[in-house]
């Protein structure tokens, strides 16, 4: 990862043949360290000021960089959960510990960062897209950010609270393989009807290519998103009925070594 300067393109680690991860459409092959740095870069509340073990040279836009917190005082942070005057009051630490796979201290760090970025206690879709766009200045990330926002907004109220945020993060980072695959399926199932259609997957692929932008190597061909969708369905649509169910999705992913490796890259990100 480039420590300073412009953000790396999603195509930086692409193989010379231009192949992609079958599940996500992203270039294959990032190391766990590289993925950790990229993931932390996408989560301002997990930036270098919040997690001292991450290099201080980690590039985070100044507008998104969280304030350097004072040394964590467990009692004072817990008081913030109970007495916060923000618009949305989060649930208590103990309850969030029971609902997620984060420790008390991890929740404290995540909450302080989330509150720095979202003083009101929630983030709406437009703010989410604005934050996300700053990590992909070479492309248009707005559509993909909308899909990602909807995956975090599980109760579909148009906002992501701290509870929503850590619930999704807990699945992505600490969930079982099945948990993570279910979360990914929900991301791709845009209308939440229990199956993925070619139209939905094409929308996802186009949004990923849009986010990557035109400054990629090798240059992307116009038909690339549709070709990726066809490849996806050839692998995932086991009964060839034109849709991919959650059962087909999980079964196909579990048989794909590349996908399984990509799932394991999220282990111990924070």
UniProtKB/Swiss-Prot annotation:
A single GO molecular function term of this UniProt record: calcium ion binding
Post-translational modification Phosphoserine, affected residues: 9
SUPFAM superfamilies for the chain: EF-hand
Topology in membrane: Lipid-anchor
Biased amino acid composition, Basic and acidic residues: 1-17
Segments forming domain EF-hand: 81-137, 140-175, 176-211, 224-259
Protein name per UniProt: A-type potassium channel modulatory protein KCNIP2
Binding site for Ca(2+) 3: 237, 239, 241, 248
Localization terms from the record: Cell membrane
GO cellular component terms listed in the entry, alphabetical order: plasma membrane; voltage-gated potassium channel complex
Keyword entries, A-Z: Calcium, Cell membrane, Ion channel, Ion transport, Lipoprotein, Membrane, Metal-binding, Palmitate, Phosphoprotein, Potassium, Potassium channel, Potassium transport, Repeat, Transport, Voltage-gated channel
Chain intervals for the UniProt region annotation (Disordered): 1-33
Region (Interaction with KCND2): 257-270
Annotated lipid attachment (S-palmitoyl cysteine): 45-46
Family: Belongs to the recoverin family.
Tissue: Expressed in heart ventricle with isoform 1 as most prominent form.
